[in-house]
Amino acid sequence: MTSSFKEQKDRAIEYADARGISIDFARQLGYGNDGIVWVTDEFTAVKAFLRQSNYSRELGCYQRLENLGIGEVGTFEIPSLVDSDAKLLIIEMTLVTAPFLLDFGKAYLDQPPDYTPEVLADWEAERRELFGNRWPQVLEALGWLRSYGIYYYDAKPGNITFGDES
């Protein structure tokens, strides 16, 4: 399922109405290839996904972390799952403050993707450059996620934030 901004917003409204909450559409927290994220009046975030595959991956990761009682990896806080709706492709999660790690729509559960060693080396070199001297902290967090069976490949500023970026 792919959808337009209007369709995502309509699904978010339907979700909010069913839950008895309001979404502040003026407070968009994020927008990307996976979907759009808005703030609710319950101080949670609602993410409307573009595709079923990203919804399923992200939901699976949040459920795994919840079942393990994990709310942070390394020094990074992770949102907790509040609710979800598979028909509407919506996930509601807690708001987090930096330092945080979020956006699991491109993560893999229990099995890493079948990338060649060259692709992985290029990916790591790009991330090392993006994060600079902070890369060891990011690498530690990714190691923790792997120990929980989550292979996270959307490491970029914005998804992994330290809180002192200027």
Q: PLM features: residue spans?
A:
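Conserved structural core of kinase catalytic domains
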Residues: V73-W135
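Conserved hydrophobic "DFG−1" position in protein kinase catalytic cores
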Residues: V39-T40, A48, D83, E92-L95, ...
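Nucleotide/phosphate-binding site architecture used for ATP/NTP-dependent chemistry
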Residues: E7, I13-Y15, Q52-S53, L59, ...
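ATP-binding glycine-rich phosphate-binding loop
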Residues: T2-D41
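Catalytic-loop of the protein kinase fold
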Residues: L142-P157, F162
